[in-house]
Amino acid sequence: MEQPLPTAAAEAAAAGGDGEAYRIRPLELADISRGFLGLLNQLSPSPPLTEEAFRARFEELAALGADHLVLVAEDAATGRLAAAGAVLVERKFIRRCGRVGHVEDVVVDAAARGRGLGERVVRRLVEHARGRGCYKVIINCTPELTGFYAKCGFVEKNVQMGLYF
Amino acid sequence: MEQPLPTAAAEAAAAGGDGEAYRIRPLELADISRGFLGLLNQLSPSPPLTEEAFRARFEELAALGADHLVLVAEDAATGRLAAAGAVLVERKFIRRCGRVGHVEDVVVDAAARGRGLGERVVRRLVEHARGRGCYKVIINCTPELTGFYAKCGFVEKNVQMGLYF
């Protein structure tokens, strides 16, 4: 098995250098056995997802094509997933049938934080939305994370309100 | 032509009383000639939409079925549109493949404000999201509108950030 890169090199590689320690790629069905559900649980603790339910949702999202993209960061050495995020493209009538990218569910494994992985995933999601013709991308986050998203190029805009059933 | 209801009665009717002054219903193709584009322009001023572009986007959204609903409020007396709003249903993996409703592009014609129309449209969009199995509905708004959405049952949650291309 390839020797894991020493931390400093991992940091450089995580920042997108050559010989990447982490590969950012679209979610795959097999990711259910590479730690995807564990990542989700760090984002929003909930009872485990069955493989069947995962597969069904995976296929529903695949049917939406490029309008809904889930990206993951795979540790090149272990094959385990270290981060994930999603973007969905909303089709509007305003702005001459404009499109808006909604970034959702960004999570970095607690053991892999501080290596720029979250920023790499978010930037890839933003580029995907740009490529889909969106005029903007939005993200809702806690006040503690506004600094992180400012680093990714976002600015504070509005208030997010929620209604729970 | 039916005599327009006196203002007080219009207010009562707008609040969903009998003999409704406004009917809340899904967007129709013919709404391009009932003031839909003028409403959008009040929401986000932009060059007029061609009928062809409107039709193409209408059909794209129709293909998403109940996961993307645009509602309008039609003045029963004139057939003109007085309000509009949309909700899109996001399919997630978290929360055991949970769904979230995103309320977007709520607008009430300047001449029809103060009659509870906006609240009626928002409540119908919320009910649609509930019916689609969403565990919550979210909306992004300016600080000035948080009171309105609180009246509709929303609570302040997070910060919305944006990145414009």
Curated annotation (Swiss-Prot), chains A, B:
Tissue specificity, please?
Highly expressed in the root elongation zone and at lower levels in leaves and grains.
Q: Tell me which SUPFAM superfamilies the record gives.
A: Acyl-CoA N-acyltransferases (Nat) (SSF55729)
Q: Where does acetyl-CoA bind?
A: 114-119, 149-151
Q: What is its EC number?
A: 2.3.1.4
UniProt keywords (A-Z) are: Acyltransferase, Endoplasmic reticulum, Membrane, Transferase
Q: Could you provide one GO biological process annotation from this protein's UniProt record?
A: UDP-N-acetylglucosamine biosynthetic process
**PANTHER family per record:** GLUCOSAMINE 6-PHOSPHATE N-ACETYLTRANSFERASE, GLUCOSAMINE 6-PHOSPHATE N-ACETYLTRANSFERASE 1
The UniProt function text for this chain reads:
Acetyltransferase involved in de novo biosynthesis of UDP-N-acetylglucosamine (UDP-GlcNAc) in roots and is required for maintaining normal root cell shape. UDP-GlcNAc is an essential metabolite that serves as an initial sugar donor for N-glycan synthesis and thus plays an important role in protein and lipid glycosylation.
Q: What is this protein called?
A: Glucosamine 6-phosphate N-acetyltransferase 1
